[in-house]
Structures are given as C-alpha cells and as structure tokens.
Regions:
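C-terminal, active-site-flanking charged/polar segments
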Residues: 519, 535-541, 553-570, 682-683, ...
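Extracellular glycan-associated modules
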Residues: 575-783
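Hydrophobic alpha-helix feature that most strongly marks membrane-spanning transmembrane helices
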Residues: 463, 488, 541, 565, ...
Length: 783
C-alpha cells in the first residue's frame, strides 16, 4: 500500500466506508507512451546505415527517418557498466559496476551488484502502472548468482521486470543459448536444423509478451528492454544472410574507413574537417612500452591490410560478411516488433530508444578467431586450420570473432575500441523515435550526452518523477539529465556539462566541449597512475581525437585532470584497478558452495552452469551413472558437460557405452565399450587417471569405461587446460540440452536417454587445478 487509507473503519461494516485507492493496481499517467528500449551489443558507431555504415539495417533506417539520430552519445566502454547506467540513470561506479559483473573486487565501486538505492527504470515504471518485459542479455548480476540455488534478487525479475526471456551472462551461443524464462532455465524450442536462432526466438517472445497484456488491457503501457546478443561474439548468422554480403568487404578494413568517413561527412554526422585516426593510434606493441619497458598488449594491434597474404584477406573478408549478416538478420527481427506495433496502432505512441552498449570489440586480436575457446585455452589459431571453416563460418560449427581491424573500421572515424576511453570505445549509436512526441523527423542531433541520460529522458517523456523511495529503499539521486529538450531544438546547447570515464585503469573526462584522456592498459606494473600521459582534445570540433592539444593548453589540461579526480570522488570511482586479468580473477569472492571431492547430479533438473559444475581440469576424475535399462534397450546421453568447442560426455548408442572427450573443438577422443549394456539396473562409469602434464596444465592419462565393475574399454586422452566454455554450456544429466559435445549422439536434440538415469556421481581427486592465465582470457572475452 503506497497511499494512506482514507475510508472509515467502525465495528459494523454498515457504519464503515471503504477506500479502494490504496489497493488498486497502479495506473500510468494519462497518455504515457509505451517504451521500447533496444540495446545492441558491441556495435560500433560506423556499422549501421544511419551512422554512415555499409551494413544494411532497414529497421534502424526506418527509426532514424521517423525520429532523431544522435552523433555525440556516449557509454562507459564496457558491457555491464554501460547497462547499469542504462537501467538506473547513475554512473557505473555509483552502481558498483566499475567492470563486468564477473570481475567484482569487493568495493563500493566494483562489487557486481546494483544497490537497491539505485532503482532500475523497470522498478520505477512497474510501480507506476507499466507492464515491464526484458528480452535477451542481462549481465547485471554476479557470477555466483547465475544458478538455481542462488537468490534471484538481482535477476531481471528481482529488479522490476514482470517477465524475462534471455540469458544472464555476458554472451551466449546464438544457435544454442543459455535460456532463462522468468526465474528458471529452459531449453530452446527447436534445433538450428529446424530454423532456431536466438534473435528470432526472443522476438517471438517479445511479441507474445506484448499481446498477452494488450489483449486484456490495451490501454496499459509497456516498458520493454530488448537486448539481443548481436553483435557480440560469437558472430552467428544464417548462411543466406551472410551470403548477402559476399564481396561487399573485399576492399578491406582500411578502405572501409575511408568510404564510411566520406559518407558520414555527407550525412552531416561529423564535422567536415574530421580526420581519420591512424589504424594503430597507440603504435605497435614493439613501439609502445611502459616506463620500465613492458610492451603494450599484443592483442590491441591491427595488421595493415596491404601486408596480409591473400588467403588471410579471404578469411577476414568472410568474417566481416558473417558479422554483417548477423547484424542485418537481427535488425530484421527487430523490424517484426516495429511492424506489429504499427499494425496494432501503437507505434506512434511508442518511445523507441536504440543504443549500443560500447564500441566495436577488438577482442578478436589482430587475427580474429574461428573458435574463441582456442584463445581461452592458450591454443594458437592457425590460418590453415581456420580456412577449413571458411564456408561454415557463423554456423553452429564455429565460435567466431573478426580481427581488430574490423573493430577499427566499425568505429570510424574514432580510434581504438571497446574498453578504451577514446571515442572508439565510448561514442556509440543512439536513435530516438516517438512520432506522437517528437515533431522533428529524420534529423541529426549533436548534443553531448551519456548512457546515464536515458533514464531521466524516459521519466520525462512518461510524465513520471523519479521516486524518493522504491521497495522501501531511499533512493540516491539520479545522476543523468533529460535529453527531451533536444527533440525539437536542433541547435539547443547541451544541458550536460561534465562526464567522467574510468575503465580498467584507463581514464577520461569531458567538460564543456573539451576532453582529457589517458591510456593505462590492464597490465600488472605498467606504471604508477601519476606517470600516465594525459592527452587533450577539443572534441567539439575534433570528433576523432586526432589533434592532441596538451602541449598547447597545459593549464586547461591540468584543470580537467583535477576535475577528473573531483568527479571520480563524487561517484565513488576509487580504487582504480589496473591489475592483470589473472590478478583480478584471483580476488577472493563469495562463492555459492566450496569445492568438494564428490558431486551428485540428478536428471530432470536445470543445467548446472560451468561456474558451479565440478572442475575436472588437470586432475583425475571418476563418473558413475546409476541407470535402469528397459527390456527394449535404451540409448541417448547419460551425462554431458560442455559443448563441441570443449567438453566430455557419456552416452549409449547401438547398445554400446561410449565416452567422448572433445579437446577444445580440435579433435574428439572417443572410447567405446567392447560389450553391450545389459538390461536392468547397471552402473556405467568413466574413470580418468592422470599420469602427467604435457604441456603444463594439459593432463595426459588413461580413460577407462566400465559396465558395472567390468572394464569394457580403455584409451589414452589429454584434457584441456581451461574451462569447457567461455559462457554457458554447463552440465546435464539424461540429455544434452545445449550445443552437443559430439555429433555422434543417437537420436535428435536434446538427445535424451531413453532409459532411466537415477543419478550421476562425479569424484575428483588431487588439488583443484586452475590455469589462471586461461581463466583470465576467458573472463575478458565474456565482457
């Protein structure tokens, strides 16, 4: 009850007067629009057509034509931090999201939990009569909360959303996603062979959610937070969509930048004098070193296009084609939502906001990858091996990412990419369309704004004041400002004065058209922060940050540096953390349970996430499955952990017991029984005995399989050093509900065991082994 009871209560109801107002469902302000909040992932400034890009996005064009294109809107440079701003209207460090939620370090600025004093826009609107829906990527809860034993307080349904369908982590396989429906994991409705793709699936659910409520209360507005996995790696696209771009990127990434900058100038997106930043603005790793000689990160480098052999160019062209297909395909799915809103008479009264969470990603490094799990496991990508996948790139057979050259291209004209406080990391697409509320159509806006400014804009447009208390928590002030003033005033001066940036030790500050920025890579011992070299740019006229004016205006630079410290203190930006990923990974964190020697798993349960599943890396292990085989026989998956990009499985096929260990997707190690599995009760086992390590962290040994106590097969195998998956692909009993560990399973998805699995017991021996370097690579690729 949010309002006091104003009726009369006496002994007899006949002498009492009711008051229903405190007990009524909340009602939205009269005429409040629907809100469709679309968040692209890792889509740089120069990928989509409304921003001069060469990737076809007709739905984005449609929204730009019916609304406004903002050229000077900014993010934090990373996923969870930006999404926290988009949800609360507060800075990322105020939200406890200085980095991705998995990299929490136990301080107010970096703990992986948005405080309840910083309510989400969904929490605010639910209490004001909106239906609230979340589709797609969340990435706003700590890793130890992404499981069925955890509290759901930081899941979407715990932070104001009435319905949720998507995934909780940083990325997912688009063909076999880690699906959660409301508060429980579910399996996808069909297989890729039957036409499944995550972008289409969440669109189907989005339409279902809208129709469910509108059929009952058509006047009740909705707030929908729609966050596809596109275009974060893996870049998974239906082949026919990727093939639309055959030959379109043959010019290479450097020529792409030139073509797109010319288009951007023609479209009035950037000043006519905007220069194109160098392809390696920080220099090569050999050229750029710390004060004591440490080289700059080797992954943060672009190979000049004209130095590449033709075969390498061929691979990189196809990687761009697949990425473009992924983007266009998802744009098409978003178009289905826009079409429905128009057909049902709702589009004019829907505020549509489209953003990306950061710049294009350079995490593919100079060479890109066909299987990112290779990088996470320290296995070098081979051009010869990658070329074998050229024709199936983007299919379920690959887990791919383009090279960093395309990240620079899709961030044109800016320098660097995601994670950097240069504009390549933080200046990102923003479209706003609201036909009933914005008179201007198809115009460009250049006012400087930030992700924190969208929540106050939504509140302004819906006629709702920021609440002082939400769910009993007194609220911290919203830190952003409304952008509504700019809707019909193209020349209005920005009402934002200052914005601070901090990400993994790299810092920036913008104030009244000027920006100071310093690069500080996350390398242990790179330098003391006092040794950082600050640069100065007049970004009002130099959008690409090509002209460093630090030497020309030293006093202005010092003022901005001082302002950075003031703003960082104001928004709890300390401590700064420039440690390596390995050091961040080893920070002690709360755990759901302590590691143990024995794990017991049951069928007909939710998939166990990789982070909570038994760790068998570089150690001996034994799995024993208690099963019941009917007289007619049985087949299917008994136990599966991981996927075709790394994992192991125990299954029955053609009456025989089989064990497969898939080494990072490179090769399968299969051991089959010499005898058939009998009917009745049996124990089916696979026991690995570690005999050595070669190379380090790669265990070598003997794997034996047993039916009851009889050894029925044996062979030597090697186990991979890192996790089975970068994200998702956990542990299942009685089926394999995600990407299959092997293509040898009998039957069809999800390859269920047709007998009965009572339980599977996994015993592990020896010390828990974690290859910190590999774990760190995997963590950073998830951001």
């Amino acid at each position: 009850m949010t309002k006091p009871f104003k009726g009369v209560v006496n002994l007899d109801i006949r002498d009492s007067t009711p008051d229903w107002e405190p007990y009524e469902q909340p009602k939205a302000p009269e005429g409040a629009p629907n809100v469709l909040y679309i968040v692209w992932d890792d889509v740089g400034f120069a990928a989509m057509e409304p921003f001069g890009g060469l990737i076809e996005t007709p739905t984005m064009n449609r929204l730009a034509e019916s609304g406004l294109t903002y050229t000077n809107w900014h993010t934090t440079a990373l996923c969870s931090p930006t999404r926290s701003c988009l949800m609360t209207g507060r800075n990322h460090t105020s939200n406890g999201m200085a980095c991705i939620s998995e990299a929490a370090i136990g301080f107010p600025n970096a703990n992986g939990h948005i405080p309840f004093e910083n309510a989400t826009i969904a929490e605010m609107l639910t209490e004001r009569g909106f239906n609230t829906y979340m589709l797609g990527k969340w990435h706003l809860c700590a890793e130890d909360e992404m499981n069925m034993a955890s509290s759901k307080r930081n899941w979407p349904i715990g932070r104001g959303f009435e319905r949720f369908y998507g995934f909780l982590g940083a990325e997912t396989n688009q063909w076999y996603p880690d699906l959660v429906h409301d508060n429980h994991p579910v399996e996808q409705p069909k297989s890729p062979e039957e036409g499944y793709h995550f972008s289409a699936d969440i669109t189907d659910k989005a339409l279902e959610f809208i129709r469910d409520a509108k059929a009952i209360a058509p006047e009740r507005p909705f707030f929908m937070y729609f966050c596809p996995g596109a275009a974060h790696a893996p870049h998974h696209a239906p082949k026919e969509w990727a093939d639309k771009y055959k030959g379109k990127f043959d010019m290479g990434y450097e020529r792409y930048r030139e073509l797109v900058l010319a288009r951007q100038k023609q479209m009035g997106l950037v000043p006519e004098n905007t220069a194109l930043s160098p392809i390696n603005p920080i220099g090569t790793p050999a050229e750029t070193k710390s004060p004591d000689g440490k080289p700059f990160p080797a992954l943060d480098y672009v190979k000049p296009w004209d130095t590449l052999p033709e075969e390498e160019k061929q691979l990189y062209r196809r990687m761009a084609e697949v990425y473009a297909g992924f983007l266009s395909y998802t744009d098409h799915q978003i178009g289905r939502i826009i079409d429905f809103l128009e057909q049902s008479g709702q589009l004019d009264k829907t505020l549509v906001i489209v953003v990306s969470d950061n710049g294009a990603s350079g995490e593919g490094g100079p060479t890109g990858s066909v299987n990112e799990n290779n990088i996470a496991n320290g296995i070098p990508d081979s051009l010869e091996e990658n070329l074998k996948y050229l024709e199936v790139l983007g299919s379920p057979l690959t887990y791919n990412h383009y090279p960093s050259g395309w990240a620079m291209a899709f961030n044109t004209p800016f320098k660097m990419w995601k994670r950097y406080s240069y504009n390549g990391g933080i200046c990102d697409p923003l479209l706003i369309s609201w036909p009933a509320g914005i008179k201007s159509r198809g115009q460009v806006r250049h006012q400087y704004h930030h992700a924190t400014d969208l929540v106050p804009t939504i509140l302004d447009c819906t006629g709702i004041e920021a609440p002082e208390v939400v769910k009993g928590y007194t609220q911290h002030p919203i830190e952003g400002v409304s952008m509504r003033y700019s809707f019909d005033e193209a020349q209005a001066r920005t009402n934002k004065q200052t914005q601070y940036y901090e990400m993994l030790g790299t810092r920036g500050i913008w104030h009244q058209g000027w920006k100071a920025v310093t690069t500080h890579p996350a390398i242990s011992g790179w330098s003391n922060y006092s040794q950082d070299t600050w640069e100065l740019y007049h970004t009002e006229v130099d959008r690409s940050e090509s002209h460093n004016l630090a030497a020309q205006y030293p006093d202005r630079l010092q003022e901005l540096i001082g302002l950075w410290f003031f703003e960082a203190g104001k928004y709890q930006g300390f401590p700064l953390d420039d440690r390596s990923a390995i050091e961040i990974l080893t920070t002690p964190r709360p755990q759901m349970t302590k590691p143990r020697d024995r794990y017991v798993y049951y069928p007909n349960t939710a998939e166990i996430p990789e982070s909570q599943a038994v760790n068998i890396r570089n150690r001996s292990y034994a799995m024993r499955a208690e099963v019941e085989i009917p007289a007619s026989g049985a087949e299917g998956v008994v136990f599966a952990h991981g996927s075709r990009f790394g994992g192991h499985a125990l299954y029955v096929k053609d009456g025989k017991l089989h064990y497969v260990y898939n080494f990072v997707g490179s090769f399968e190690q299969k051991i089959s029984s010499t005898k058939s599995v009998p009917t009745g009760a049996s124990t089916l086992s696979a026991i690995f005995t570690k005999e050595g390590e070669n190379p380090p962290h790669v265990a070598n040994g003997t794997l034996a399989i047993y039916i009851n106590n009889e050894k029925v097969g044996e062979g030597t195998i090697r186990t991979q050093p890192g996790k089975f998956s970068i994200a998702g692909e956990g542990l299942n009993v009685g089926r394999d509900g995600g990407e299959p560990v092997t293509g040898d399973y009998p039957g069809e998805y999800p390859w269920p065991f047709t007998g009965t699995v009572k339980r599977v017991v996994v015993d592990v021996s020896g010390e828990v082994n974690i290859n910190l370097e590999r774990e760190a690579h995997g963590m950073l690729m998830r951001d």
